[in-house]
Amino acid sequence: MAKLIFLFATLALFVLLANASIQTTVIEVDEEEDNQLWRCQRQFLQHQRLRACQRFIHRRAQFGGQPDELEDEVEDDNDDENQPRRPALRQCCNQLRQVDRPCVCPVLRQAAQQVLQRQIIQGPQQLRRLFDAARNLPNICNIPNIGACPFRAWP
């Protein structure tokens, strides 16, 4: 009988330890996710909220078209007169290449959401084009190892 009680006590201790380690793992994953989100938010702000990408996304949402048709779109938000004015798509791609790979899709989602908040989007077709443009920018800009971003059209 004493052996049976000892066996059950040992088994209960193992279950308790396994449960505690599972909870610790979950907490560590949550902290890691929070750090990743914070790092991506910092990069979004550091790269001027990807204004060139926002401009490109906005034009694609409103007018559709292929990226090469919008290549001549010039970034208007250029306050520094010493910097040459460059097409919005090219400037967007340059900004995206400076973002850490794990943050590319999160910052593009933020850029699309900012366009959605600031601009008048008329109907579901423009909304779909807006998020399609943001989702496909890594492919358009040839960002290695990213492909299309996995977010959906509804923020």
Swiss-Prot record:
Say yes or no: keyword Magnesium present.
no
Q: Which InterPro entries match?
A: Bifun_inhib/LTP/seed_sf (IPR036312), Bifunc_inhib/LTP/seed_store (IPR016140), Napin/2SS/CON (IPR000617)
Cysteine pairings via disulfide bonds: C40-C103, C53-C92, C93-C141, C105-C149
- Per its record, what are the GO molecular function terms? nutrient reservoir activity
Tell me the lineage of the source organism: Eukaryota, Viridiplantae, Streptophyta, Embryophyta, Tracheophyta
What organism is recorded for this protein? Capparis masaikai
Bias regions of kind Acidic residues — which residues?
68-81
UniProt region (Disordered), positions on chain = 64-86
Signal peptide feature range: 1-20
| Alphabetic keyword roster | Disulfide bond, Pyrrolidone carboxylic acid, Seed storage protein, Signal, Storage protein, Taste-modifying protein
Q: What SMART domains does the record tag this protein with?
A: AAI
List the coiled-coil residues.
none
Residue spans crossing the bilayer:
none
Propeptide residues are: 21-35, 69-82, 155
The record's similarity note reads: Belongs to the 2S seed storage albumins family.
The record ties this protein, via Pfam families, to:
Tryp_alpha_amyl (PF00234)
Superkingdom to which the source organism belongs:
Eukaryota
Assembly and interaction partners: Heterodimer of a small A and a large B chain linked by disulfide bonds.
SUPFAM superfamilies annotated for this entry? Bifunctional inhibitor/lipid-transfer protein/seed storage 2S albumin (SSF47699)
Its job: Heat stable 2S seed storage protein having sweetness-inducing activity.
Q: What is this protein called?
A: Sweet protein mabinlin-2
PTM annotation (Pyrrolidone carboxylic acid): residues: Q36, Q83
